[in-house]
Amino acid sequence: MSDLARILVSIVAILTTVDLAAADQSQEDLLRQRMAFWEAHAPHCKAGDFDSPTKATTDPNQPCDDGDMTMFNGLLCYAGDERGCQAVIDAQDPESGQWFRSPRIRLLGHNDRGDASFSPDMALGVQLYLVKKGDTERAMKWATWLNGLVYKDFAPWGVNWFNKLTDHNIAWFCLEQYGCVVRPGDAASLGLTFDYLHDKKGMPVLPDGSIRGTAASWVKWEATFMWLSSNNRPGYSQHLHAVDILLRRLINGDDNAYMQEAKDLAGKKENEGNAFFAWLAGKSRAEVIDQTLKRCQAPDVLPKPPLFQWQWERDNHVDPGQLLAYQQSCYWDCIFMAKLLKVQSP
């Protein structure tokens, strides 16, 4: 190759690098601008003195679709959004220690959105908050409340089988229905969370009882439950697996823990375009930003009410006559991604 040819090749390489850098910067700027747009349009649930992130209904008399918000607010808290942290705090009764699905539902005293007042999914959001903030006081109040729940003997035989294995009555997150049960995988996560708060943050030992016995019995099997969760069904079940990976990384202090499990999630065809899964799997910043911008709203492409979707918990399947999840995004899922990417609105 002649000297002139080498010079030309070098110039082309430099120009290409500059163009790519400019493109990346352009995407960064666009994400920052979109962040301001999402912030301006994201719905809030106002109840009593509380003003917290929510999904939305189209009912002006009850505009808050907040039945799952304690989990989503825990995710926002993890990503550094203090509004999410405060919403998780406000969803707990400060006297009893009981946690609810949202601050509004706590004030109401029951879940008018259907189902029980709490669930294993919400417990993941609570644990993200507890570990992120090292809040041993609220953790102890919650554990004490859980431990004091009267055992409900209305569960199927499987729970009674768990009881025999642990020599403890299985614990419950609430008492309204069978879905409140602390399953073995939930117990393993609780065991990891309470062990972390005890070992690293000085939380007292849990009182003897169902929650301590259940958590201690199953925490040793946490790797097995993580493997089982990797086979979860598409949609929200796989999203729960992703949230569990996030929690365990936070506890371990290792952003690369369970990386293969995260890559497996992101690589599934039904999850193509899921920016949260891509971020969790360690995809490049440019790729994650690109996926976020493709599915998060722009001023000229507005979502269609009701804004009731946290799109990262949905796969790409859509039933006839229905919209894709990102087309009905609540905006907070997009704010969550921007916060994960440490982007601030201008």
Residue ranges and their predicted role:
Residues M1-L8:
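Bacterial N-terminal signal peptides that target proteins for export
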Residues L8-T16:
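Bacterial N-terminal signal peptides
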Residues D24-G48, T136, G235-P346:
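Terminal, non-catalytic domain-edge segments
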Residues Q27, R32-P63, Q92-D112, G148-L165, ...:
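Glycine- and aromatic-rich loop/turn segments at beta-sheet edges
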Residues Q62-G80, S117-K132, N163-Y178, P234-L250, ...:
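Well-ordered alpha-helical segments within folded domains of soluble proteins
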Residues A79-N169:
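Extended ligand-binding groove/face enriched in aromatic
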Residues G84-V88, M140-A143, S189-T193, N256-A266:
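Alpha-helical repeat scaffolds
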Residues C174-T193, S210, T214, M226-N232, ...:
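Eukaryote-biased recognition of C-terminal alpha-helical segments
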